[in-house]
Amino acid sequence: KTWTHFVAWAKANPGKLSYGSTGTMTSPHLTMELIAQKLGLELLHVPYKGSADLMQSILGGQIMAAADSTGFAPQVEAGKLRVLNTWGAERLAKFPDAPTLKELGLDLVQNSPFGIGAPKGTPEAVVKRLHDAFKQAMEQDSYKTALARYDMVPMYMSTSAYKKFAQDTFTREKALVEKLGLAKPT
């Protein structure tokens, strides 16, 4: 019923609480594993090929919980699912009663911003032109409206901030993938 119930049940039943994600090594999967590590939980991960398969399984009762970033709002609004927490820095306007991980005592914010890259060696003038065009597009009301449909919050980052974010995310997730034994031998 609540995140507190989820954690208590998982602790009392190690390895029995099944949760689905949109696939192995996706952000939802890795974030759930990080949460489990921080809380000392042993969860049963069930990977799916995307949100549609995941949604069918949670609604059909094949899994007990689901970690996904979008697509669940209609089911929550219909009373078929509930949001136990959100992973952003702030609560979602659509689900104001769902606490963030930080509010639940986990020092963790997981966002999956979209970015655009260019080949190494691309002239700075071209990088700046692309950056400025995408920044301008992100400021458009139509962009913000499109994100809101999926309960996503605009998250602008400068070129250098996004580069640092991507590097930090790669480092953190690489360590987690190795710890989980998911890294393929090279």
Task: Identify the function of each model-found stretch.
Residues 41-42, 76-86, 93-104, 174:
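Ligand-binding "clamshell"
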Residues 34-38, 52-63, 73-80, 166:
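Short helices/loops that flank or line small-molecule/ion binding pockets
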Residues 38-41, 77, 124-186:
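An extracytoplasmic/periplasmic, membrane-proximal ligand-sensing/linker region
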Residues 3, 51-52, 69-70, 95, ...:
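Structural motif corresponding to alpha-helix initiation and N-cap regions
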Residues 48, 67-68, 86, 157:
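Short beta-strand and adjacent tight-turn residues that come in two discontinuous sequence segments
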Residues 13-17, 39-41, 59-66, 80-83, ...:
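Alpha-to-beta junction loops
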